[in-house]
Structures are given as C-alpha cells and as structure tokens.
Amino acid sequence: MPLLTGVALALVAVFGWQGWQKYQANQSHGASLVYQQLLEAALEPSGQPDVGKVSELANTLKNDFAGSHYAQYGSLFVAKVAVEAGKLDDAAAELQSIVDQPADDSLAELARQRLARVLAAQDKADAALKLLDGKVEPAFAASREELKGDLLVQLGRADDAHAAYEKAKAALSEDAAVGGLQMKLDDLAKGDA
C-alpha cells in the first residue's frame, strides 16, 4: 500500500508540475500578445499614439498579468504617452508604481530615472534628486550620475553638478561615447550652466 501511495504522489507531482509549466507558458504568451498590441497602439505610423487603446491595453496587462515584466513595460509606455500629452502627474503615478514594486532591479532603476526626469519637469528637482539617493548597479551608475548632474544644474548647484558629471564620466567604460557628457562639463567650466 505505501508503494502505491508513493507512486500516486509521484504521478500527481509530475503532472501537477507539467500543468503548472503549461499554465505559465500560456500566461506568458497571453501577456506577450497584449503587449504587442500595446506597442502597435503606442507606435502608430502617424506618430500619434492611440492614447485610449494604450491605456486600455496597459490596464489589461496590469489586471490580468499583474507584476509581470510585460505589465511594467506597459506602464513605461503609458508614462511615455502621458509625458507626450503633457500629463506629468499621470506619468509620475505610472512610474512610481514600478518603483514601488519592480519586477526586477533593472526595471526599478529605469523607472526611477524616468520618474526623476518627470519630477524635474514638474520643478521638483529636490524630490527627483532624493529619489536617486542610494545604491545603484554599476551598469546604471553613469546614467544616474549624469541625471544627478542635470538636476543639480537645475537647482543652481554648479560645483555639485560638475562632481556628478565627473562621477558619470568615470563610471563609463573607456570606449563609451562621452561627447554629450563632456559638453555638459565644458559648459559648467565656462559658467554657462
């Protein structure tokens, strides 16, 4: 009898695992299809995204595939469309939702930097700067420091901005393009910032 119970439990485990794997694959495929539709709505050939459709599809991703990468990429597009429409509060809310519960560290940092730019556009550079405090992965160090420099320039803190731009430059690999960053440093040196 224990042998039959063991075999039955093993079969249940195997078939349960296979069922779970199939469910996960179907969920991923479904999210991928909705995300593809969102991309098509956001990147209309006319240059004008279908705002209503983008919002509807992003809500579908959030509701049906919550916490997935696709749902958060959808939120990034909603934020982009909101910025283009001048709805900075809506963009900030979308980005904040990713920062609060990111699907992974890369999405968290991407959303954090975009949110900082939105806050800066709302004349909230201090809040944006505070958002960028803390540890950062080396892959994002240069872009975060450059953004800090931009925010510090906006706040009129040229010396601190120069230091941030230097940190950004130091964080770049030797073969990275530093043209734009060097122009910002040169502008600060001339006092044009």
Question: PLM features: what roles do these ranges have?
Answer:
Residues 28-46:
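Short extracytoplasmic/periplasmic juxtamembrane "stem" segments immediately C-terminal to an N-terminal membrane anchor
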Residues 42-51, 59, 69-143:
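Alpha-helical adaptor scaffolds
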Residues 177-193:
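Extracytoplasmic/luminal low-complexity segments enriched in Pro/Gly and acidic/polar residues
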Residues 137, 156-176:
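TPR/TPR-like (Sel1-like) alpha-helical repeat modules
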Residues 84, 121, 154, 187-191:
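Register position in tetratricopeptide repeats
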Residues 2-23:
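Single-pass alpha-helical transmembrane signal-anchor segments
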